[in-house]
């Protein structure tokens, strides 16, 4: 029910970009109202579990962590828990997209068919930014609210799952939820990036809306995006959580400092980025193509015409982008989440 509601409203965000007569104040007011409507309904359908404090033991069991979990029956506490993940997710998503967008553009142009120069080179590196800003906040917030909620639920499930298994499952479900909003904005962004600076996000959106297969075009590459994001999160989040845990054990603390969360996020993001580059190349080819391509055909075509190493095109900017992105995104999320908990916001 949560996903159905967000799915039905995600294209309202995209439609904003078509209305040329909208002013900035009107857009901001409209977004705030819609965000509140979405989030208030999410709260109704989510009973959030809240982690207790992490206790550090000394002596014989010095390196053993006991995570005491409990359900919080209070609706007020559940809403606070939800809004902590929500607020931190929004800030983290906007921070990483605004700061590292040019690197993402260069990576897309390297991977797109035709090569770097033909697709625009260094010209217009902020093409497609508008679509990402529209989808960034709802996508990131949907991911982290799902991630934190599922961590609590799985810890209380009695299934005997280890921490890495809990992090993997929670992150995977978070990605599936976030991609409902993220994929349409990603399609518009990558087509704008690969246009050589000749098309804006609005132009591409108008073209898609006029096509005979609007839904298919908006969700071109949804399957391969999930196939890329789930392995990425299966690698990134367990590494991130494990490295943060090592910092806490080393310094006998129950929370991480800002630089610890950022460094852990950077390492985890870089490793995951390198290992999942082939998925990203295939996704880029499918999303930037004007024709409907299958995953298998795209992979065979790349290997046959460009060689196996073509599946690793753009690996350097991708690793740089996601290493920096991991530091900003996960570091920012962790710091803001701790701040909101400390201040009771």
Swiss-Prot record:
Solcar repeat extents: 80-153, 162-246, 256-339
GO cellular component term of the entry, any: mitochondrial inner membrane
Family matches, as Gene3D superfamilies: Mitochondrial carrier domain (1.50.40.10)
Keyword Transmembrane: yes
Protein name in the entry: Uncharacterized mitochondrial carrier C12B10.09
Subcellular location: Mitochondrion inner membrane
Keyword Transmembrane belongs to the record: yes
Topology versus the membrane: Multi-pass membrane protein
Pfam families found in the cross-reference section: Mito_carr
Segments passing through the bilayer: 83-103, 128-148, 220-240, 262-282, 296-316, 319-339
Keywords: Membrane, Mitochondrion, Mitochondrion inner membrane, Repeat, Transmembrane, Transmembrane helix, Transport
Organism whose genome encodes this protein: Schizosaccharomyces pombe (strain 972 / ATCC 24843)
One annotated GO molecular function: S-adenosyl-L-methionine transmembrane transporter activity
Annotated family: Belongs to the mitochondrial carrier (TC 2.A.29) family.
